[in-house]
Amino acid sequence: MLLASCSSDDAPDNETPVIDPVLTGEDLIVCNEGNWQSDNGQLSYYNSATGVLTNQWFRSINGMKLGDTPNDILQVNDTLIAIAVNWSNIIQYIHPDGTACGATENVPNNRRMCSDGTYLYITSYAHRCGDKTFEKGYVAKIDVMTKEVVATCEVGWEPEAVKLYEGRLYVCNTGGYAFSENHEYETTIEVVDAKTMQSLRKIDTGCINLYAEASQAGPYLCVNSCGDYYSVKPHTIVLDCRTETFRTYDFPCTYNTTDGEKFYTVGSEFSYDTGEYNYYQKTINPTDGTVTDGILCDAITEKLRSLVSPYEIYMSPYTGNIYFTDARSYATAGYLYGYRPDGTPVFAEQKVYINPAHIIALPKYK
């Protein structure tokens, strides 16, 4: 007679159970743009364990300046963070502890980034990358191991946000230099094959100047059109990358973020005719297209409405906390705020640096 043993009978007595790490909090990196052509961009670091915010964080660790007008920051993987330093014409790489670990120096006038963990994709307003020249702007593909540009694709004039969905890059063309150069504003989102770096087609949104960052919730992109600051009003575009169809809304989403399901937007509408700003706080459900006034709860919405010059909004993918900044005068120190989804503050108001424009969270586990 044969007896079959259960799998547990074969397990060693000294087997150690696997314990999943527990999220205990998150630190923040705030990328302060400084003033254009002043070479005073900075990183600020908020330590959630100590409650201390450190300005000039990058410089204190590396003994050098970050550079002139850092325009985007992105966590590429667990060990690498990329910073697009626009007017210094470099992409600076750091580890999460702040130590510099290389740079890419042949993508001038760089703007916005996305990544699949293996490659970094970055837009540029420039007309040159290494020995290649372009009539308009382009997207560069960078190997994150070597930090070398491996391919480029010419797109429209002055491309801004770039996002990746199912092997395709979606590039928001602006034509933002139309006021000073001999071309029109752009209205298109360009679709590029991320593998071959060939342009596939353009999606004409009918809205000009697709400027500022875009947020991505699954297949949906939230894109800002800021108009021409005169007679052409700003809009928000929500694109479904599966069908490449879109909805258009009659308000801007200059600063936008997502929890993976909805978009939370703060729109800044400026008019050269009046010299005034109007601000909008909206929540968009991309699935059914509905829009509601306000963001998350009354406490957060009212705080956002009290800001002098809102300059960034970011929702943590780890905690669901929402963080935002106030640039105030654009020439002196700005401020950082953090709230839980129920409207309770994460910390007291934090003084950062000039034009705090980009935020990422670093999760902490035990």
Predicted regions and their residues:
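Bacterial Sec-dependent N-terminal signal peptides
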Residues: 1-28
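Repeated scaffold domains used in trafficking and secretory/extracellular systems
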Residues: 18, 65-74, 108-117, 157-166, ...
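Residue position within the beta-strands of beta-propeller blades
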Residues: 30, 83, 122-124, 171-172, ...
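Short, solvent-exposed loop/turn segments at conserved positions within beta-propeller repeat blades
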Residues: 35-39, 84-87, 128-137, 178-187, ...
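Post-signal peptide N-terminal segment of secreted/secretory-pathway proteins
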Residues: 39-117, 129-130
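Beta-propeller blade signature
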Residues: 43-47, 135-144, 185-194, 235-240, ...
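A short beta-strand motif characteristic of beta-propeller blades
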Residues: 52-65, 98-105, 148-153, 198-205, ...
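Acidic, serine/threonine- and glycine-rich low-complexity intrinsically disordered segments
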Residues: 154, 159-270
